[in-house]
């Protein structure tokens, strides 16, 4: 795989996720009727810029970037030492760094505190509606896992941050590692299984050179998810994704279809909504993100996940430049994409 193509898809995944996050963050806690009164009949359709001309990201993009940084730092540490821990261990310490940016004191000193560029970025040291489950789990001093759940939460705070697990193949199964990264804070299968599937989809899209239809990628990833975890909650989640795919083939208005899937406050609903919007608008990033956020639920998370999916498929070069120009922290996002690309290229021995 060419390095330039790898970077385009990694950067596309991170940037489009941030665009969807920013678009939805402005209406995260608003009902659909309130959104229409504020933005018009079609809802929000433009970047919600503030006085400085920039739209704000939320905790979704913050945690996604820390996931990315934890993976990169962990890779180079393991490479230098010749042996390393499982990737979720490195990600856990990255989340402790994020926890510090929220004004909290972690129960242990994060491994990455001296070297985290993100921790030293002033604009990231701010609260953007962080999830209570994430904060509570990280304050506990315990690292949750799929086998040893830290709680019974199926909130979408697990899935909204795990796209980067699809970037690296050297850590093993993206499906399993994405689930483990979510299970650090979210112990219910409905919280970590969608995260695993998102990571798996991202990996298929980043490394897919056959330009397979997005629906084929979704169904292949869903099949792998059900095969890996034969659990009632996982099968229930799979049924929801199938329903989302079928709804995307109807003439039902996007808002009605999304409300039929749920509010996106929990992991399975959030991924299903994102899948719906991406399948409905597979070649139009703006349309997909507008679709994914305009509803009465967790708009920033559904927008972020939809952006991760389409960005991984279409790449940075396909994203709307006018929206990127209106987004804060694009330099930080692109730097993280470059750092990840360098690590992946090294692992794959790309020139």
Regions found by a protein language model. Give the residues of each.
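Structured, active/binding-site neighborhoods that engage oxygen-rich ligands
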Residues: 1-351
């Amino acid at each position: 795989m060419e390095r330039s193509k790898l970077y385009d898809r990694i950067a596309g995944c991170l940037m489009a996720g941030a665009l969807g996050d920013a678009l939805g963050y402005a209406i995260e806690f608003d009902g659909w009727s309130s959104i229409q009164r504020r933005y018009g009949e079609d809802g929000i359709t433009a970047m919600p810029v503030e006085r400085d001309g920039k739209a704000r990201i939320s905790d979704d993009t913050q945690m996604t970037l820390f996931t990315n940084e934890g993976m990169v730092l962990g890779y180079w540490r393991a490479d230098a030492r010749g042996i390393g821990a499982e990737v979720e261990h490195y990600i856990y310490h990255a989340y402790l760094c994020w926890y510090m940016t929220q004004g909290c004191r972690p129960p242990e000193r994060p491994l990455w505190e001296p070297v985290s560029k993100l921790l030293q970025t002033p604009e990231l040291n701010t609260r953007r509606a962080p999830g209570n489950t994430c904060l509570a789990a990280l304050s506990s001093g315990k690292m949750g896992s799929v086998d040893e759940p830290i709680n019974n939460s199926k909130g979408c705070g697990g899935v909204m941050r795990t796209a980067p697990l699809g970037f690296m193949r050297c850590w093993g199964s993206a499906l399993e590692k994405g689930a483990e990264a979510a299970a650090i804070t979210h112990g219910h299968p409905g919280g970590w299984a969608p995260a695993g599937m998102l990571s798996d989809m991202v990996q298929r899209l980043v490394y897919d050179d056959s330009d397979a239809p997005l629906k084929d990628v979704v169904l292949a990833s869903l099949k792998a998810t059900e095969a890996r975890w034969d659990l009632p909650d996982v099968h229930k989640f799979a049924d929801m994704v199938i329903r989302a795919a079928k709804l995307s083939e109807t003439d039902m208005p996007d808002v009605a279809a999304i409300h039929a899937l749920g509010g996106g406050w929990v992991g399975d609903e959030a991924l299903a909504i994102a899948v719906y919007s991406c399948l409905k608008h597979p070649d139009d990033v703006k349309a997909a993100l507008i679709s994914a956020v305009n509803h009465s639920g967790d708009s920033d998370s559904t927008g972020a996940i939809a952006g991760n999916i389409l960005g991984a498929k279409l790449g940075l070069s396909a994203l709307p430049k006018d929206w990127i120009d209106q987004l804060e922290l694009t330099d930080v996002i692109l730097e993280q994409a470059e750092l990840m690309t360098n690590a992946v290229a090294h692992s794959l021995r790309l020139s």
